[in-house]
């Protein structure tokens, strides 16, 4: 944890900051090991560049041995006044994007004239590059996702509803000891798969339809995410061709990932494959997103992101083609940027398969 705090402090110094309030519960855990869901109550870590960090905790939080100095409050005390007594009102204060206005505005009233700036990047950029312990947890979450995906492929049958299949996915995660899903499972049959974020409904799987399953679990606080697309029976020539196209786009992007490569160029590698086949207009989202303690963390793989890949980054590669009124295909893996290239965390087969027969 000390190494993580020092990395954040270095980022703060690079931005000219001497102090910061970290309030995102996942970032607080990342830096201190304290895991709390505060709900409407105040949870904050005061992090100075020099000096001991200070945790501000409600007495209802189950934190028996705080790893640093702790200032406690109950429900009738004013925790913002406690923070005001610790911060340097003459210096700029960085805050993260999760801190509610109901705490920030009173602090500014306690400390009139204090400059406040958004400093989420100081923590988020550190969280983007996973250390070895985090990489191990991400591999395990992806291994479970592969196993559950393989089970789903065997489970799906013509006549089932999208909700039935989604419920099976969720039950499998619990059976594998996961805390739950990293996001709401997406199951899309036929034309529903042309909506990238379709919510499972009572649509019944019919012969000849595509089956798109986008799924992820949360295990030991870390998330997985993958998508596979199959067909209920032998696909048509068009369905098979689109699936093969998306598969090639996925592989083209993954082959490019290594330290120093711009993330916009990774996006372009997949997009070019699809565009050259005449389907560019039907790939209507970015190629990928960063992932870790949450399914979508800061950072993406898109045409707008000129940042370069760095060792330890983990993000999705998920090209898709979505044909309104017909079907959709998406193939998604998570990749870990290594020192020399990338490691694809998902091993489950990406080729099209016949299911439900």
What are these regions (language model features)?
Residues 1-357:
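Active-site neighborhoods and metal-handling regions in enzymes and metal-associated proteins
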């Amino acid at each position: 944890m000390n190494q993580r705090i020092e990395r954040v402090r270095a980022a703060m110094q690079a931005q000219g900051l001497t102090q910061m309030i970290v309030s995102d519960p996942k970032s607080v855990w990342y830096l201190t090991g304290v895991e709390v869901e505060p709900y409407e109550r105040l949870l904050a870590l005061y992090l100075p560049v020099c000096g001991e960090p200070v945790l501000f905790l409600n007495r209802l939080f189950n934190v028996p041995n705080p790893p640093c100095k702790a200032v406690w409050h109950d429900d009738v005390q004013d925790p913002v006044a406690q923070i005001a007594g610790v911060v340097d009102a003459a210096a700029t204060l960085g805050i993260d994007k999760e801190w509610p206005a109901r705490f920030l505005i009173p602090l500014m009233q306690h400390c009139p004239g204090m400059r406040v700036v958004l400093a989420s990047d100081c923590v988020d950029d550190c969280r983007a590059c996973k250390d070895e312990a985090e990489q191990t947890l991400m591999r395990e979450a992806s291994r479970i996702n592969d196993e559950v995906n393989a089970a789903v492929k065997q489970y799906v049958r013509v006549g089932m509803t999208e909700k039935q299949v989604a419920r099976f996915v969720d039950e499998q995660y619990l059976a594998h000891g996961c805390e739950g899903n990293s996001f709401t499972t997406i199951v899309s049959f036929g034309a529903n798969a042309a909506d990238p974020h379709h919510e499972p409904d009572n649509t019944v799987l019919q012969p000849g339809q595509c089956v798109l399953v986008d799924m992820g679990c949360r295990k030991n606080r870390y998330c997985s995410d993958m998508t596979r697309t199959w067909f209920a029976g032998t696909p048509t020539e068009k369905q098979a061709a689109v699936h093969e196209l998306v598969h090639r786009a996925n592989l083209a992007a993954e082959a490019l990932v290594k330290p120093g490569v711009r993330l916009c160029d990774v996006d372009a590698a997949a997009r070019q494959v699809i565009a050259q086949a005449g389907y560019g207009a039907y790939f209507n989202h970015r190629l990928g997103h960063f992932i870790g303690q949450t399914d979508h963390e800061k950072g993406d793989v898109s045409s707008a992101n000129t940042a370069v890949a760095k060792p330890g980054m983990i993000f999705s590669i998920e090209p898709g083609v979505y044909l309104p009124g017909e079907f959709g295909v998406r193939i998604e893996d998570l990749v870990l940027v290594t020192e020399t290239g990338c490691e694809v965390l998902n091993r489950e087969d990406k080729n099209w398969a016949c299911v439900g027969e």
